[in-house]
Regions:
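Acidic/polar hotspots within intrinsically disordered regions
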Residues: 5-8
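Non-catalytic alpha-helical scaffolds and adjoining flexible linkers that form interface surfaces
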Residues: 21-46, 51-271
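Hydrophobic, Leu/Ile/Phe/Ala-enriched alpha-helical segments that form helix-helix packing faces
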Residues: 1-2, 250
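Intrinsically disordered, low-complexity proline-rich regions
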Residues: 3, 13-19
């Protein structure tokens, strides 16, 4: 029987068969990305977790950005969590750690990095998004939602900002398949957090909302534009209760969700 040789997936009869698998080359690609997490590596480099528009969740090595030389000064600041960047990356889907060739601001915030309460909200959103992202799969609709959310947060009034964590926490699950069904009514006033829907009666377990908490949750689910958040007037204690309930909702629907590290800070800062 004639032997055959594979070149780029095509078998050539009569040629020797190579024992080595085909190696995928690194390709340069342009994409936007939202920085999730940064870890120092070596003396001058960073390893950065980024949610990209084209490839989803990715990890990158960024060399030389922490160098004390003139060339490296200030570049590490671009990799703060929540930063929205334009990237040119070396992408190889077989690698767990790729490299960034070029980077620059896509959107430069006015307030998120300098305003303490606003930064606390942004970091809460980043942590929530990070806990939901499990696989390096592209999700352009989710990326657009997150990009718009961070830009709106940066430019919003204090009244909108105070309700922004609630808005983000309720609308993010739609992209992961566990959005709460907004079927609240006088006949179905109890939100079952385990089932993610409203019922007429309380369940036999403790994970549910009723009364004003269920009603406000329904109102927040109806909001499609962040500007509408200014119409919902809540006090600090009520927001804390809702944030705690929404954290419970995530724990019920995402395996190994754990505890939100940013939530205690957020509870103290938002009035």
């Amino acid at each position: 029987m004639p032997r055959r040789h594979e070149i780029h997936g095509v078998y050539i009869p009569g040629s020797p068969v190579s024992p080595w698998p085909t190696i995928m080359p690194d390709r340069t690609q342009k994409t936007k990305g939202i920085v999730l997490r940064t870890v120092k590596y070596g003396e001058t480099s960073l390893i950065v977790s980024i949610f990209t528009e084209l490839f989803g969740l990715q990890s990158y090595m960024v060399s030389g950005v922490r160098a004390s030389t003139k060339k490296g000064t200030g570049k590490a600041n671009l990799f703060q969590p929540t930063a929205i960047l334009d990237l040119v990356v070396y992408h190889n889907e077989l690698k767990h750690l790729n490299r960034i060739k070029e980077f620059k601001w896509h959107h430069l915030y006015k307030n998120i990095f300098s305003d303490v309460p606003r930064n606390a909200v942004a970091l809460f959103m980043i942590e929530l998004l990070t806990k939901c992202l499990k696989q390096p799969e592209p999700n352009p609709e989710l990326f657009e939602f997150c990009e718009d959310a961070f830009i709106h947060l940066d430019e919003s009034s204090e009244a909108i900002m105070a309700n922004f964590p609630l808005f983000f926490a309720l609308h993010l699950p739609a992209f992961f398949g566990f959005r709460i069904s907004d079927d609240y009514s006088e006949e179905t006033p109890v939100l079952d957090l385990q089932e993610g829907t409203f019922f007429a009666d309380k369940p036999d377990y403790l994970h549910f909302l009723e009364g004003k908490q269920a009603e406000i949750t329904s109102e927040l689910l109806k909001i499609m534009q962040p500007e509408e958040l200014a119409q919902i007037k809540l006090n600090q204690d009520f927001r804390r209760q809702l944030l705690h309930a929404y954290e419970t909702y995530y724990r019920l629907h995402i395996q190994d969700f754990g505890t939100m590290k940013t939530l205690p800070v957020l509870r103290e800062l938002l009035g």
